[in-house]
């Protein structure tokens, strides 16, 4: 994935989860949703992917209504179907069956003017893991300040 084509990234996912693996997949969108996503009007809060009837669905993704849209504007929180190969879906099912694993959208990006979603197979971090990461960040910041002022 090229960073120039990155539309939006879920920064909270890296803090709240251990990302085991990333999978790129397509997404079924309506016209006004495409325009809103390209304008970066979406929110990842509490969004996740689930497997229903041999299909992968993205749930709780908030895509704001397109400001130029009319009465045919989309529902903001509707479930969106993710397009993925059957083999990858079977592999995701195996991970999902394990205790503590979940599927989280990591980023939205453009690939040849088509919007793609990067979904991560994630395991939740405990509170002490998050505290350890914050402690390491503060130590790095203090060291860089000391080096800068010497």
Curated annotation (Swiss-Prot):
GO terms for cellular component: cytosol. One of its GO terms (biological process) is trans-translation. Pfam families: SmpB. Keywords: Cytoplasm, RNA-binding. Its main location: cytoplasm. It is found in: Cytoplasm. GO terms for molecular function: RNA binding. InterPro entries: SmpB, SsrA-bd_prot, SsrA-bd_prot_CS. It comes from the Bacteria. Required for rescue of stalled ribosomes mediated by trans-translation. Binds to transfer-messenger RNA (tmRNA), required for stable association of tmRNA with ribosomes. tmRNA and SmpB together mimic tRNA shape, replacing the anticodon stem-loop with SmpB. tmRNA is encoded by the ssrA gene; the 2 termini fold to resemble tRNA(Ala) and it encodes a 'tag peptide', a short internal open reading frame. During trans-translation Ala-aminoacylated tmRNA acts like a tRNA, entering the A-site of stalled ribosomes, displacing the stalled mRNA. Belongs to the SmpB family. This is SsrA-binding protein. It comes from Borreliella burgdorferi (strain ATCC 35210 / DSM 4680 / CIP 102532 / B31).
């Amino acid at each position: 994935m090229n960073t120039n084509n990155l539309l939006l990234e879920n920064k909270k996912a890296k803090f709240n989860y251990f990302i085991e693996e990333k999978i790129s997949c397509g997404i079924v969108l309506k016209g006004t949703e495409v325009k809103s996503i390209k304008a970066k009007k979406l929110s990842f809060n509490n969004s996740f992917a689930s497997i229903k009837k041999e299909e992968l669905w993205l749930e709780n993704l908030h895509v704001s209504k397109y400001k130029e849209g009319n009465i045919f504007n989309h529902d903001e929180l509707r479930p969106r179907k993710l397009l993925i190969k059957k083999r990858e879906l079977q592999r995701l099912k195996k991970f999902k069956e394990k205790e503590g694993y979940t599927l989280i959208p990591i980023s939205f990006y453009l690939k040849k003017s088509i919007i793609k979603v990067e979904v991560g197979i994630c395991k939740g971090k405990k509170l002490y893991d998050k505290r350890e990461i914050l402690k390491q960040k503060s130590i790095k910041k203090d060291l860089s300040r000391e080096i800068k002022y010497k």
